[in-house]
Amino acid sequence: METQRASLSLGRWSLWLLLLGLALPSASAQALSYREAVLRAVDQLNEKSSEANLYRLLELDPPPKEDDENPNIPKPVSFRVKETVCPRTSQQSPEQCDFKENGLLKECVGTVTLDQVGSNFDITCAVPQSVGGLRSLGRKILRAWKKYGPIIVPIIRIG
């Protein structure tokens, strides 16, 4: 009788350990990677967008150096998305779409949570201020210098 109780008790402990072992991997599987969380945020941005085409992740800044591994705490993110050739109404994944030549580029910043079940994000995307204006101004100055520099330099030396 005593052996039967010990055997039953051992069986219960084995069952508890087995259940605990099965529960642990599923708990850790609920945390998304930093990149996966951003890709989910991009999907949500595409769903809420009123623009014609889907956007796809172009570049992701490295994750912040944090000691906190809690997937429920928002993590700061910074990334860039670019317009693709796929219409927003298509059911295609943005990752399968080619980037549109001269497609619109957007810089996005905000926070994401890595929790797979209740993943939240607060992302703002904007078209970056054009540095092309500065480039074209620089080119104009360079062209003017090449054209008028040989005339101006002797005048400056005389004066």
UniProtKB/Swiss-Prot annotation:
One of its GO terms (cellular component) is extracellular space. The modification Pyrrolidone carboxylic acid is found at Q30. Residues 30-131 form a propeptide. One of its GO terms (molecular function) is lipopolysaccharide binding. One of its GO terms (biological process) is antimicrobial humoral immune response mediated by antimicrobial peptide. Keywords: Antibiotic, Antimicrobial, Disulfide bond, Pyrrolidone carboxylic acid, Secreted, Signal. Residues 1-29 form the signal peptide. It is found in: Secreted. Disulfide bonds join C86-C97, C108-C125. Belongs to the cathelicidin family. Exerts a potent antimicrobial activity against Gram-negative and Gram-positive bacteria, including methicillin-resistant Staphylococcus aureus, and fungi. This is Cathelicidin-5. It comes from Bos taurus.
